[in-house]
Amino acid sequence: MLLAAALALALIPSVTEPLTTPARADTSAQPKVTRSADALTVSAPATEKTPGYIIDIATGELAITTERAGEAVLSTAGGETGGLRFRSGGQWQHATEVTDWAWKDGVLALTADTTLDGATVKARLTPTSDRYQLDWDVEGGSPDRLGLAYDLSSAGHWYGHGEAETPQGGPGVDQPWPLDTGEVEHGTFGPASYNMIDPFWYTSTATGLRVDTGDVMDVALNKGKDGLGAFTVESPDTYKATVFVESTPLEVYRDYIGIVGKPAKSDATYEQYAKPLWNSWAQFYTKVDQEKLLDYATDLHDNGLDGHTIQLDDKWESNYGNLTWDPTTFPDPKGMSKKIHDMGFDFGLWVTLWINLDSDNYQHAVDNGYLLMDAKDTSKPCEVTWWNGQAGIIDLANPDARAWYEGNLKKLMSDYDIDGLKFDTRFFDEKCAPREGHQATDYQKLGTQLADEFDLQGAGIRVHWNETAHEAGFVTRQVDKGTGWDSLRASATQNLAICTIGYPFVESDMIGGSGGQPAPSKNVLVRWAQSASLMPLMYASTSPVDTNDTTTGQKVDYDQETVDLYRQAIETHKKLAPYIWDQVQSTLKTGDPIMRPLFFDFPKDKESYTVTDEWMLGPAVLAAPKLSTGATRTVHLPPGTWYDVNHGTVIHGPKNLKGYAAPLGVTPAFVDLKAKGAAKAIKALKRHDVPAASVLISPDAPSTGSGTPFEVTTEATNWSTRAIRNVQAALDLPDGWTATATGPTTAKSLKAGGTLTTTWTVTPAADARWGGHDLTGTVTYDRAQKVSDTVRAEVKAAPGSVTAPYLTTATTDDARYAQGGDQFAIWAGGQDLSGWKDEKGVIYLDDAAGEKATVQAQLVSQDSTSPFGKAGIALANDLTAPGKGGYAVLVMTEQYGLEFMTDSDGNGALDTWAGGGSTYHPAYLKLTRDGTAYTAYASKDSETWSRVGTADVPSAAGTGDAGMVASAANVSYPGENIEAVFGGFSITS
C-alpha cells in the first residue's frame, strides 16, 4: 500500500519557492539614486521576476551595503581593512571619503579619497534588475593589485570558489562547506591553476559575486578566523565585479550561468554514467607493469566488479613526453590491450602536455618551436617544474605544435587499440609567455578544444575559468584526495563546490583516495563507493579485492564483504543510471547542476544551508551516505513527503531522523515523492534486506578520567512499517569497566517509529589507560536480529608530574606533564618547532642514547587547534641546551602527517625536513642513530615500518638525551595549546 501511494504521489510536480516573493512592480521602472547627509542610495525596483534591492553607499568612509526587503544581505568590510582596497609600495590602502558623485545614463560614478596621499579611487556602479556592475580603479599611487573585501557575516554563509586551498589541507583532505565555516587561503587563484576554480561566490542571503579577470587572484575567506572575504586581483588594471541580488541561491547560480554559459553537450556516454571507470593510479601509483595491470583487470572481471574502462595511468612511457612504451615494464602493449578488451572493458591511457627535458621528443619540440616560451626571456623555452620533473609545455596556440602532438596521440591510439585518454596536465604556466596574439586565459580554451577531439572515458578534464570550459560539458574529476575519512567528506563537499560554479558533470576523486597515502581501510573504501554511487559518475581505482600500500610496499587484502558491498554500490549506481541520464538531459536544457546542495531545492529550509553530508541528486533523490565511523547518523529531511528507500516508509519533513540506521551495508537515501522522476528513482533504490532497527549511542565522543564515572545513552529505534518484538539493549565495555542502567533495557515490542531509550552510568577501570576505548551499544530483537553502534570514549590524563629517571624541560612557559605507569602526557604551547622557533615541552631521559641507539614510542593521541601542532620523539646531545647539537625530531602534525626534522649545523634550529602523508593515531615512531647518521621510521601497528627519511647530523657527539616532545605550533593560533599522550617509550643503546 505504501509503495503504491508513493508512486501515485510521485506524479505530482514539485515547486521551488523563493526566499522572498518579489513584489509586483511596473516593469518599466528604472533604478534611481537619492542622497542624504551621509549616504547615497541606489534603488533597483522589483519586477515580475526579481525581488528588487537597495544599495546604500556610505560617503563619509566609502562602504557599500546591499539590502533586500529591508535587510542587509551583503556589506563591504570597514575599519582599517576597507571595502575597496589596493596595495602600493607593499602597503595596503583603501578608499575613504566620497568627494564627488554623478548619476548619468544609469551609471553612478564615484570619486573617493584614500588612505594614501595622492591616490584617488574612481568607481562606477551600474544597477540592473537582478545585479549591479562595480568597476573601479586607482588614479595615482602606483598600485600593483586591487581588491574587494566583505564582512562575511553580512551575507550569511558563503559558497562557490571550487577546490579550495586551506590551512587544514585543502583541497586534498579538506573542503569547508560553507566556506566561512573553515579558512580559505588561496594565493594563486587563477586561470592557469590546476585546481578546478572560478571567480564566483554566492551566499545564503541570495547574493553573489563574480570577478571578471584573467589575472591571478589572491583569495582569502575567514583567514585566521578574521571573518572577512578578501578577493584581490594581482593587477593594477580596472577591477571588474558583478554583484548578483536574487531571491534564492539557485537564481543567483542561474544568473551566473547566463554569463559563463551552460554545457552544450555531455562528453560522457550513457555507459560511462552507468558504470565505473577503473584507473590504475591509486592501485599501483608508478609501480605498475603489464602483468600487474592484467591481474588487476582479471580480479575485477572475475569478482563481478563491473566497469566500462580499464585506464592505465602514469608510468607507462619510456620517458615523459616520448609517447612510446617502456619496453621493460610493457613488453607487449598490443597484446595487453587485446586481453583487456576480451574481458569486456575499453582501454585507456594517461597523457600529459609536459615534455621532460631529458625525453627523446624535447629537443625536437624545441627545434620546431612547439613549446611555450619563457615569460622573462621569450627567446628560450619555458622550463617548469611538475610532479615528475623539469619540462616544457606544448604550445597549443601554435597550430603546428598542436598538429604534431595530436598526430602522435592518434597514431599511438591506432597502433595499440586505445579507446580514449586521460589528460592530466596544465595547459599553461605563469612562468611562460602566451604566444603572440593570445592571452593566458586562451590556453584553457585551447586545451578544451584539444581534449574534445578524444574520448575522455568519464575521466573528463580539468579546465575552467572560461566560457569554452563551461560549454564543453566535460566530466570534472577532483584533485587527488587522501585515503581517510576527512578526504571522503571533502570529496562530497568539493563536488558541491565544483558543480555550483558551473561544472555539473562531477565525480569524486578515485574511490578510496589517490594521494599517495596508506591504503584506505575497508570501511572508508566501502563508504566511499556508496557515496559515489549517489553521484553522477563513479571513478574507481583501489580494488576491493586487494591493493598495495604505497607507503610500505605491502599487499593489502580486503575480505569478501568488502567485495560484496563494493559490488552492491556499483549495481545501485547502474540501476540509478536511467534516472541520472534524465538529469543529464535536463542539465543540458537548464544548466542546473545534477548533484547540488539541499538549499538549491529547498531555499526556505534554513538547516539545509549547513548540511555537509547530504545532497540532492536531481530533484527527486536525497543522498545521505554515512561519511564517518559508526553505524548510525542523523539525517535532515527538508519540507516535503519523503520515501525511505531502505525501510519503505513515508516521512513528512522537515524532520531530523536521529540515530538513523546506517550499518556498513546500508546507504541512507530518500525520494521526494512530489518531484519529477520519483517513480524511476524508487524503482532503482528500493531495498528489502535492511535491518528494521538501529541503536544510537551518545554522546559520540565521551571524555572522562581513569576511574571517573560518566553517562551514555542508547536509543533503539524501529524504522520499519511493522512492530518488532523481544527488544533487548546492552552495552559492551572494555575489560575492567562497569555500567549500570537507569531505565528499561527491554521492551516486549516496539511499534513502527517507536524507541527504547536507556541511560547508562559507565565507570572506567581505576587504572584505565589514557586514550580511546570502544563502547558498543547493542540491540537484539525478533530473537535473532542484532544491530550495534560504537563510540570512542577518551580517557584523559590530568596534569601532574613524572617520576625518576624521567625529567622535563621546556622552551615555552605553559608546559605541563603527567605520567601513569608507562604512559606520558604533555600539554604545551609554543609558536613552532622548526627553523625560526624551537618552543616545546619535553619529557626525556638524560644521557641515555649512545652513538648507536634506537628511540621508540607510541604516539597515542594528540589534540591541538592549530593544524600544525606537533608531537613525537627527539634526540640531541643535550635537550636542555639552546644550541643542542645532534638535534633531530620525528613528529606527527595535527593535519599534515609526519615530519622528520634535523639540525644540519648544530645551532639548535631544525632546518632539514622529510615527511608528509596523512595523520593517524596511534602512530609508532622510531629514530635510529649510528654516529652522525639519523634515520626516522613510522608504523601503524609496530610491525610494518616505513622509512620517513635519513639525514646526517654532523654535530652529534657522544651519549645524548632522548625523549618525547610536543609543540602547539600556534603562531597563527595565539594562546592555543596541544595535548599529546605517549606510551611505550624506550631507548636501546
Identify the residue ranges that each predicted region occupies.
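Secretory targeting and sorting signals
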Residues: 1-25
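Catalytic core of carbohydrate-active enzymes
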Residues: 470-476, 494, 498-508, 513-693
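Extracellular glycan-recognition regions
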Residues: 29, 794-989
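Short acidic/proline- and small/hydrophobic-mixed sequence motifs that coincide with surface turns
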Residues: 631-633, 722-726, 772
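Aromatic- and carboxylate-enriched substrate-binding clefts and catalytic-loop regions
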Residues: 149, 176, 306-566, 601-603, ...
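Short glycine/proline/serine/threonine-rich loop/turn segments at secondary-structure transition edges
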Residues: 766-775
